[in-house]
């Protein structure tokens, strides 16, 4: 089947927002208008089309980003619905990596909320052009102008309204289009129909003021228009469109629109703006990668280039097994063909290709450059792998994922389910790179680790529902680490001579505190240790560092210099030097003032003014450091750094202290030293 839509008629967009800002509802409405859904799903009823996992429908939050294809005015739009809960930021990172642009949805009552900032920062990292849709204009307390101000203050973004609302709360009727200078009034019932009329008298001055501000912001990004504007010439609608599109794609301007998805107002105009101002795959820089010799290469969005595709998500489907969601950057992927997974250097056969609608799928023969779809039948591909033409290998830049910060022990309720649980956990870990599972060497328990309590709750929930594994879960454990404070020199000597061949390994090392990755420096001169044994010393040290001397936690933030040693012509072996390296490390660590480190979280708590004192007192009692307080939309925002170990069950505490009105979000900040009294307790419990 030939390509249906040319590349310039493609839009790959993400929809991102704070939890509950109305993201899934907005996506639903887009699917409704573009003819993909016949009945609109309501999140309240647990029937939204995009939220297709059972847990999402129950909790009313979006967990897995479903990629959906829809059509509007001769354009193909691929939408990725991203989760808004902070425990799932990896899903957001992954989606942003493969999008060309995004719509940020704000709640008109709250404006920019904590998670909006997190997601916005991630979008900045990938330089994703954005538009803002101020949603829920019909609810009590909705304030469009305050919301726009929060974008400028908190996100430091150049937010430029291209619409302003007519009325608010129950009286919200539509908006003024500042480019056409017309009022758009929606039908009261379903909002599907609307009329373009003259601007109401009482809004004319405001519309003029905001139109002037919009034009000034646009001409600042275009010298020719600036000259025209300064000379007092009229700037045409066409010129505004062209300049605004250019400025949006260059991340110089963020256009702001308004509406209410739930009442169907403003979605058609949002779709028009997506086509008008957001980039097609041709408008964004070509993707860079490296070839097999390590040289940088570019892949352009064209069907004629060799295939270059990125697997950005792996999902397990109950009917077809493993689905790999891919973005085709260049070339064409054919079903039934063979491709190279360049990260693993293995050939893969493309089984079937499907384009996804939220939860039904359409089989296709080919996926073209610029498209998003899913592949069935890949054996070795995991998240972040590149699939390419074997005659033109390339590795597209891979994604970095944060390390898990919280872990729990888990065991099946029956012995029979042990193997089933192992298979299920392996499948879940394949889908989600921030979820790890391993067996504790000392206790033999299976441990699962992730990004937060909700993350692990949902994993356990999925084990029970999708894989029918009933399990018991232990109390959450913090991922402590150990490090050293002083530099020391230490000796490791392993000698065994008792009949037959002996063992002899001997090294001197210097352990040095060092922020950053582990480094090993070979400073041996004069062959005190033969070259072939040096890697064994390094391996011995790295293995010993997996389990520190305080509580058996991994040791981080140090580097090693191996500067002397001795060997025996006959008795020395790699094994002996590995043991010597391990002994030297343990001896050195004991003398280097070892300390315990704990993960500290950056916490943001939003509470009504009257609960401020109570909540701050509670944060202090949790060893929290309060960094600042800012008023926001009638509430106070407390920014603090709090050790993760003190945050377990915090959601319940905050709810009871604020009568359910407080919310919080947290993300990993860094590792910090644990106070001595607490460190002794932690180590005591672990021994």
Swiss-Prot record:
Entry's Gene Ontology molecular function annotations: GTP binding; GTPase activity; translation elongation factor activity
Predominant place of localization: cytoplasm
GO CC field: cytoplasm
One Gene Ontology term from the biological process aspect of the record: ribosome disassembly
Keyword Coiled coil: no
SUPFAM superfamilies: EF-G C-terminal domain-like, P-loop containing nucleoside triphosphate hydrolases, Ribosomal protein S5 domain 2-like, Translation proteins
Record InterPro entries: EF-G-like_DII (IPR053905), EFG_II (IPR041095), EFG_III (IPR009022), EFG_III/V (IPR035647), EFG_IV (IPR047872), EFG_V (IPR035649), EFG_V-like (IPR000640), G_TR_CS (IPR031157)
Protein origin, superkingdom: Bacteria
Entry keywords, A to Z: Cytoplasm, Elongation factor, GTP-binding, Nucleotide-binding, Protein biosynthesis
Cell location: Cytoplasm
Record's function text: Catalyzes the GTP-dependent ribosomal translocation step during translation elongation. During this step, the ribosome changes from the pre-translocational (PRE) to the post-translocational (POST) state as the newly formed A-site-bound peptidyl-tRNA and P-site-bound deacylated tRNA move to the P and E sites, respectively. Catalyzes the coordinated movement of the two tRNA molecules, the mRNA and conformational changes in the ribosome.
HAMAP family named in the record: EF_G_EF_2_B (MF_00054_B)
PANTHER family per record: RIBOSOME-RELEASING FACTOR 2, MITOCHONDRIAL, TRANSLATION ELONGATION FACTOR G-RELATED
Name of this protein: Elongation factor G
Species: Clostridium novyi (strain NT)
Protein encoded by which gene: fusA
């Amino acid at each position: 089947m030939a390509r249906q839509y040319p590349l310039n008629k493609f839009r790959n967009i993400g929809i991102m927002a704070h939890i509950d800002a109305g993201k899934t509802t907005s996506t639903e409405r887009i699917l409704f208008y573009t003819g993909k859904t016949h009945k609109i799903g309501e999140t309240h009823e647990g029937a939204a089309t995009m939220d297709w996992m059972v847990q999402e429908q129950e909790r009313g939050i979006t967990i897995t980003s479903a990629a959906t294809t829809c059509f509007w005015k001769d354009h193909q739009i691929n939408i990725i619905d991203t989760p808004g809960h902070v425990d799932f930021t990896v899903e957001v990172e992954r989606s942003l990596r493969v999008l060309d642009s995004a719509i940020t949805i704000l709640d008109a009552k709250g404006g920019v909320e904590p998670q909006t900032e997190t997601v916005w920062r991630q979008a900045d990292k990938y330089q994703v052009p954005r538009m803002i849709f101020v949603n829920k204009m019909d609810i009590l307390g909705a304030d469009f102008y305050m919301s726009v101000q929060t974008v400028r203050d908190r996100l430091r973004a150049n937010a430029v309204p291209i619409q302003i609302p007519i009325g608010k709360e129950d009286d919200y009727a539509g908006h003024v289009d500042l480019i056409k200078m017309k009022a758009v009034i929606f039908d009261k019932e379903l909002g599907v129909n609307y009329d373009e009329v003259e601007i109401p008298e009482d809004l004319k001055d405001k519309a003029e003021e905001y139109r002037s501000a919009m034009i000034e912001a646009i001409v600042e990004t275009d010298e020719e228009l600036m000259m025209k504007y300064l000379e007092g010439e009229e700037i045409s609608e066409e010129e505004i469109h062209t300049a605004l599109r250019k400025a949006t794609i260059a991340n110089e301007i963020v256009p702001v629109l308004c509406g209410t998805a739930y009442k169907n107002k403003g979605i058609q105009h949002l779709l028009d703006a997506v086509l008008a101002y957001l980039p097609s795959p041709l408008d964004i820089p070509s993707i860079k990668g490296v070839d097999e010799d390590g040289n940088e290469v570019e892949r352009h969005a064209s069907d004629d280039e060799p295939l270059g595709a990125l697997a950005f998500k792996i999902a397990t489907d109950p009917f077809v097994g493993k689905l790999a969601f891919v973005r085709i950057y260049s070339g064409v992927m054919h079903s039934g063909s063979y491709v190279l997974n360049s990260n693993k250097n293995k050939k893969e056969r493309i089984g079937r290709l499907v384009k996804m609608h939220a939860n039904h799928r359409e089989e296709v023969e080919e996926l073209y450059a610029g498209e998003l779809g899913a592949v069935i039948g890949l054996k070795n591909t995991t998240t972040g792998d590149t699939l390419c033409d074997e005659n033109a290998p390339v590795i597209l830049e891979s994604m970095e994922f944060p390390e898990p910060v919280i872990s729990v022990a888990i065991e099946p309720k029956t012995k029979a389910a042990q193997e089933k649980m192992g298979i299920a956990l392996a499948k879940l870990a394949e889908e989600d790179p921030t979820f790890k599972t391993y067996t504790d060497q000392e206790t033999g328990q299976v441990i699962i680790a992730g990004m937060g309590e909700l993350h692990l709750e949902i994993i356990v929930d999925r084990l029970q529902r999708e894989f029918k594994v009933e399990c018991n879960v232990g109390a959450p454990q913090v991922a402590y680490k150990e490090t050293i404070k002083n530099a020391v020199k230490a000796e490791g000597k392993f000698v065994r001579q008792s009949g037959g061949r002996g063992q002899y390994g001997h090294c001197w090392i210097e352990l040095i505190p060092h922020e950053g990755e582990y480094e090993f420096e070979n400073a041996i001169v004069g062959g005190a240790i033969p070259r072939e044994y040096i890697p064994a010393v390094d391996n011995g040290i790295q293995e010993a560092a997996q389990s520190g001397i305080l509580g058996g936690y991994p040791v981080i933030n140090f580097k090693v210099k191996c500067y002397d040693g001795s060997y025996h012509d006959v008795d020395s072996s790699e094994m002996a030097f590995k043991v010597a390296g391990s002994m030297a490390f343990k001896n050195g660590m004991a003398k280097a003032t070892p300390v315990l480190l704990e993960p500290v979280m950056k916490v943001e708590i939003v509470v009504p003014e009257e609960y401020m004192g109570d909540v701050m007192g509670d944060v202090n009692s949790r060893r929290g450091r309060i960094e600042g307080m800012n008023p926001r939309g009638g509430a106070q925002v407390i920014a603090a750094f709090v050790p993760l170990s003190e945050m377990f069950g915090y959601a319940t505490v905050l709810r009871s202290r604020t009568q359910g009105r407080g919310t919080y979000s947290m993300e990993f900040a860094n590792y910090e030293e644990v106070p001595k009294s607490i460190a002794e307790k932690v180590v005591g419990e672990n021994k």
